[in-house]
Amino acid sequence: VNGRVYLNNQPYIQKLVLDQGYWKESLITAPDEEAYKNDIIKCKEMGFNGCRKHEKVEDPVYLYWADKLGFLVWGSMASFWSYTPQAAETFTKEWMDIIERDYNHPCIVVWDMLNESWGVTQIYENKQQQAFASSLYYMAKAYDQTRLVISNDGWEMCQTDICAVHSYMHGEKGDTAQHLRFE
């Protein structure tokens, strides 16, 4: 509302960690269910109130603990390698299944399906890829009008409820004038 995110009818600042979901012991699957709970508790102890899952559909057990512990989640999808009609069809079916599976988790506050144009590398000029990203946005909205949706997080956003800019400076002094455009 008015450019702000609200939770329980109150303005809410999301302080999120970008969560790759890697586990030292077991790579991208938690070593056990308790690990999910402990991971969320550690994030909260560090001052974060949620996470943006990165290129990973999270296990429902993680979402269960996020629900129980009051930890926000941006539900995400892993990118495909390159755009083809078959890849788009498969991706779309899987994404809709994920939304249907995870819809009832109150921890999810954003659906975030594409990341930085991965898999849709020509989206800036390619009308088919733009239509694909837009269709994902509208399908997510058709399934779930209660959550915010980002069609392509960080870069070329055809349709979006949140303007999320990924700016990588790696220690250099940033161009604050560029970032002020979004205030």
For the regions a protein language model found, what residue spans apply to each?
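N-terminal carbohydrate-binding accessory modules
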Residues: 1-45, 150
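Substrate-binding/catalytic cleft of secreted carbohydrate-active enzymes
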Residues: 38-41, 50-183
